[in-house]
Amino acid sequence: MLEILYQDEWLVAVNKPSGWLVHRSWLDRDEKVVVMQTVRDQIGQHVFTAHRLDRPTSGVLLMGLSSEAGRLLAQQFEQHQIQKRYHAIVRGWLMEEAVLDYPLVEELDKIADKFAREDKGPQPAVTHYRGLATVEMPVATGRYPTTRYGLVELEPKTGRKHQLRRHLAHLRHPIIGDSKHGDLRQNRSGAEHFGLQRLMLHASQHPFTGEPLAIHAGLDDTWMQALSQFGWRGLLPENERVEFSAPSGQDGEISS
């Protein structure tokens, strides 16, 4: 079963685990573990996607409980009326707070996007980022005798494919566990020494700016273990929990 963070008559929010597909495509038609089908079976009604999370990303995923609700949610995402906040563990010490305005060329899949236009120019892509903490661990990686990691808060202002992963790679602070845009040597070291065997990117919060509602997704065991090893426990208090209760018997946390 998936953790339901919030549900009302219009929408449902779940905490998507890393490694789960949001929905099947013709490329993944034999996939057994899919968020949409699991939520449908769990709550007993159809759900409609409003946005996406990459397969390796964990965290808050919103779905409409009708096609109209899904359409309106998607529209709010497009118009930036719903804000998203992520947390990531990155290579090196990213300590400043800034806005990166760096256009991105659309990434096309050779199979899924084989009919898409390939002559598109770079599309606007803007990300606000803020360094929260740093750590230096006594583990040699490559030619360096120690390994440095940073905990970063991210707010995408646009929604390009793999935007956060590509923007952090552009800053030379790739997300740990990113097999496509990251540092393979760092990924192997993180997995071997600290159990970081997945993309360390988590969609922590989705506030609805028109309503006094913010939905927070708790961190999984891999994240909690990393925060403990790096001395970062207490820095993400709204997300650092494994089990908790909420009004109406919902497994979630709603802050307003």
Short names for language-model regions:
Residues M1-S256:
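RNA pseudouridine synthases
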